[in-house]
Amino acid sequence: MLFGGAATGIFVFGIVMAVLGTLFGLAEMRARLQIDLAQQGNVFLLLFMGILASTLVAGPVINSIGNKIILVASSALVAAGMAGLAYAHSFVGAAIPAVLLGLGGGGLNTSTNVLVSDLYREKRGPMLNLLGIFYGIGALCIPLLAAVIAGHFAIAPQLLICAGLAGACALLFLAMHFPAASAPQGFSWREAMRVAQYPGVLVLGFLLFCQSGNEASISGWTSTYVGATGLSARTATLILAGYWAALMAGRLAVSGLLKIVGKRQLVLASGGGALIGAAILLTNRSEAMLVVGVLVIGLSYAGVFPTALAIAGDTYRKMAGTVFGLLFAIALVGGMSFPWAVGQISQKLGVRFGMVVPLAGAAGICVLAWRILRSDASVELARQSEGGK
């Protein structure tokens, strides 16, 4: 029952992460909001600011009073945000719901992951991976549903359905019984600054900064970019759905790949794949090649974030909680800044130039992953030298 509740909550978070990227690919929504590309980037910035704020607050609150209040309040915030978007007719009308979606989505993400982590201490890895699949299903549903109803129904009813689902989640969580609060120490910025000085922590942090930014840019701007090539809104949303499907399929394959490939090698290879996919997306306008580009990107992105976190967990076991908190904070700053930068560049130079941002992010991942790999090789060589003396 508790895992089912967590799966429902993370499913709603997947919807939150996919909804703006889907909506901005629809001519109907862009015309109703009367926003330019720079303002579109600003809406994404507000979404991720809300996610960052709630992520930092939710952890200590969960530690003090448990998951229930965060899950109920977060679901209610998402419901309000979806309803607000359904009736938005201006930039301000979209900006306020975006903040609400971010606040609610960040709370759902944090609380559901903490809940599953506490419930399944002996099977934490597999169960968190299973939870992530429900996130992918939620994210995939939105562009698929938008593609199905395109030209048949207005977008507002779809958003109101999402609002109703989030509201139902709030009622579900209100009726459920949750474990008592564990009351350990919450995230501390002072402690975070101390662990930031550990060798390699900031390299991993900047790698996740690039990865989070890339994921936010591709999920948020792909439908707009595809629409700018002259393809229909329905095609654009289906191509976006292809990205989410590839990401989910890749996540399912990662655990198997890690049995034959090292974690650091997988991150480097994933960065290279993301670079190739972004280049395909940037240099082609045909529908077939755009599909190839997003599929390569989705499959390549799948292994970066969870594997980098696994590297951090293996390397900094004694301070894993604080290290993870710092890494998530750095990553969310990337999630805020990259899609915003795409909007600013797109407004001045065009969407094609804006999509250089995830290409540069993929290059950054390759450089940082190579550095991690080389650093580990140097440490191993030093150990062998010490052993030979």
Model-assigned labels for residue ranges:
Residues 53-89:
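Conserved MFS/SLC helix-loop-helix module at the cytosolic interface between two early adjacent transmembrane helices
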Residues 66, 87-92, 121, 284-285, ...:
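Helix-breaking motifs and short loop linkers at transmembrane-helix boundaries and internal kinks
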Residues 81, 92-100, 288-296:
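Paired small-residue
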Residues 20-21, 199-241, 245-249:
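Extracytoplasmic gate region of multi-pass secondary transporters
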Residues 18, 47-56, 139-140, 244-252, ...:
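Residue-level signature of mid-helix packing/kink "hotspots" within the transmembrane helices
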Residues 54-66, 250-262, 346:
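Helix-to-loop junctions at the C-terminal end of transmembrane segments
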Residues 97-133:
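Cytoplasmic helix-loop-helix junction between adjacent transmembrane helices
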Residues 130-177:
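Helix-loop-helix hairpin linking two adjacent transmembrane segments in secondary transporters
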